[in-house]
């Protein structure tokens, strides 16, 4: 009889099955098979917080099939993902199938390649109870908060609202940033720049100080003009000249948080989109000449560690492709933040076969997976390459009683930058190449320019910067970053505005209530401490029952006090104004949030019950009638679609997104479907791939 191997997904089963052969049957559990009940709390608070797990309703047939296969098999191996969530799935599978969790029936794969699968199969172990308990404690904590706090929000804010332990902190961060922006008072200042020439070359230096070294930054035009006047007739000479060398090091291979941040900045991916593509790359894809294989190591990791074998493979490729001088001459190591032994069991995210280049992979995959693989591969390879070497120069220019400064650099050896440089959220200070300069050299003033500036408020969070803030504050885990953002947007607490995260009026109202009545729930330090406690459970250094009880006792007391504080009170969420007018009574319409998202309602409610669907102009023209604008609409169930504004006179509609690019053949609006753009105008038939970003 064959041995039964159970994984989460059919894709993973297919890849692993290819490596194991006919002596094994590999099947999928399709994720979790048991969970807490949806209709009730499912936790016995009075009896040590015992969870009351039930089989997931639509998994009954699958569970029956798994039991039958396990009964016939010559042994069962549980091969779910190597993290808390995967350990929990295996624990529940063992429980349902009657397996002894203390027996070596658990295997894990850091990479799904032939070698990775063989290594995992050669090292079976018992289910890690501590790892499972960490997941179980998190699940129970989140359930207690969600089920106890949500009804309170229903009564005090609006029906249908829900609250989450970690999500509430994320909303707090976003709302706090919005308050900073609102309270920010811009301050005027002026830059005074001198464009200076040396023969045919010139450079720009900025006013820095007076001759005593006192910093100067004019606060208004009068001060700037006074400095300009003081510079009339001044000689500009090279006063101080500092030359040096610096080495710029590459960034380490990705961990989960940095992968999501970089994919957001470089590719424009949401965290969810990134993890979906990464999951596909890990579980396996068909590659010409290689068959089905996992292309990257496990993508939920905090560890920066790279195996010696992978480093050697990378350096071999670098030597062949770029030359020996591009190899890092020493073993690079990066300090990983404090992680548990289980967390550090993984490597950083890297290509499972370093020699398999993106160009070769692109022949077999496309779209998000191809883009993400190229980024992961390039970042990993660059991490094993030599430093970028630069000659630096900084100059202080003397001009009468004033001092100007400029700095620049010249790349003498490109090193890792020939392949990859990290994207950034902030505008970097510009450094340019300076012409050859000598101390005491007389410079020619070509232009003296003063420019008004104002200090800028902090920027709203993007997905990338929010994930960075969550990670830096110790909130959440690699597996939770993407769901956190999805949840707070889906709940209507936060919305995207030009790729920035902005709190809605509802989100601000709920955050204000949480801050007032449950300050510890939305406290960043408190949440970070809870994450540390969960890590202690994972390491076997803390009891999960005590961790849950310590939290719940304080939470229950806060909830009881909040009920007293808010007795007879309700939080009013301000309506969002709009430019629309009610067709029934002519009053202004306001934007409200319903079960399926935002809609327009008459401000005269309840006297007038006029409503409209909220539509958004996409900028495209209807390909059917050629007259109406293409509008973004929502179906009755909240799904976004696109239709002609002339409906019902024109009934054109599509689920595919209109794009700014026009049809090269007929000039009509193009629509995006997957990785292609197409023209929907009858008889045209034009198609093209989605252009790659630079």
Show which residues each predicted segment covers.
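Metal- or metallocofactor-binding catalytic centers and their adjacent structured scaffolds
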Residues: 212-252
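Intrinsically disordered, low-complexity regulatory segments
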Residues: 1-139, 148, 209, 215-225, ...
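Structured, non-catalytic alpha/beta "coupling" segments that mediate domain-domain communication
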Residues: 14-37, 168-215, 383-430, 588
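Short acidic, hydrophobic short linear motifs in intrinsically disordered regions
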Residues: 238-241, 250-263, 290-299, 457-469
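Basic, low-complexity terminal or inter-domain segments flanking catalytic cores
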Residues: 2-3, 150, 183, 224, ...
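Short, hydrophobic-biased segments on the C-terminal half of alpha helices
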Residues: 275-279, 485-486
